[in-house]
Amino acid sequence: MDSHRPVLLNEMLELLSPKDGAVYVDATFGGGGYSRGILERAKCTVLAIDQDPIASEFYQSLHSQFPGRVHFFLSKFSRLREALQHFDHNQVDGVVFDVGVSSMQLSDPDRGFSFMKEGPLDMRMDMLRSQSKSAATFVNSLSEKDMADVIFYYGGERLSRRVTRAIISARESNNKIRNTSDLAKIIRSVVPRSKANPIDPATRTFQAIRIWVNDELEELKAGLEAASQIVGVGGKIIVTSFHSLEDRIVKHKFNALREKGFQLINKKAIKPTEKEISENTRSRSAKLRGIVKEE
């Protein structure tokens, strides 16, 4: 997977429709794919935000290509208003979100996000390690009930209790589950691979743990609320999500904002084409929604 290949890029740009002289926030900068697309589309400014310090390396490349037009602030997007103060702006013409884990995070085994390569049980998006909980906290400390609930609710894993019992049994016999390979092996031992669904049996549980570690759903709620407060009239909020729970939060928030002077840009979520899915499997579950402030 390529960290420079953002999902639904053209569709996002179509909804955002960047204008010369405008100011946009890329709330999930990552590898800079969305920011690059916006900067190439119009002579505008992008305020880039990301909680992962690694993103600053991609920012340097973009900054040299678009001097004075892109600026970076290390922050969670739930702190959008604080970030805007740092940039000395009160409002913007649009905010874009590409939520969830990035390809560059997945591809680095030292981050612990992937079950494909051995790595530490980490999964913290904030590499400064200001978060107190990690994947190790989850597998080695949570109660059976809490663990099963997280795996079922955040991962949609029907066999959540079976997975939980296997994790609890392993940690009781071995004292600790040491790395992502250990964890993936435990999950695969109790979740059969489906012929109808090609995804790895560990996918849903790893996803659930990542969402729990980073408090992703509450972050998204806070980020959307902050975005609604910083866009001016005509300003847009565009969100690409990858999980049904994320999309539900976006849909619910956008519907609520219709009572506050916002209007949906697209009534139904935009999904990737078969061509994009074949070229970038990460896009398979993506959904894109947009809303504009009309008054």
Swiss-Prot record:
Output this protein's name.
Ribosomal RNA small subunit methyltransferase H
Q: Which gene encodes it?
A: rsmH
Pfam families with a match to the protein in the record: Methyltransf_5
Any one Gene Ontology molecular-function term assigned to this protein's record? rRNA (cytosine-N4-)-methyltransferase activity
Q: What is its EC number?
A: 2.1.1.199
Q: Which residues bind S-adenosyl-L-methionine?
A: G32, G33, Y34, D50, F77, D98, Q105
- Gene Ontology CC: cytoplasm
Q: Where in the cell is it found?
A: Cytoplasm
| GO-annotated biological processes | rRNA base methylation
Query: Where does this chain mainly localize?
Result: cytoplasm
Stated family = Belongs to the methyltransferase superfamily. RsmH family.
**Which residues does the annotated region (Disordered) include?**
275-295
What keywords tag this UniProt record? Answer: Cytoplasm, Methyltransferase, rRNA processing, S-adenosyl-L-methionine, Transferase
Instruction: Give the domain of life.
Output: Bacteria
The protein's role, per its UniProt record: Specifically methylates the N4 position of cytidine in position 1402 (C1402) of 16S rRNA.
Q: What reaction does this catalyse?
A: cytidine(1402) in 16S rRNA + S-adenosyl-L-methionine = N(4)-methylcytidine(1402) in 16S rRNA + S-adenosyl-L-homocysteine + H(+)
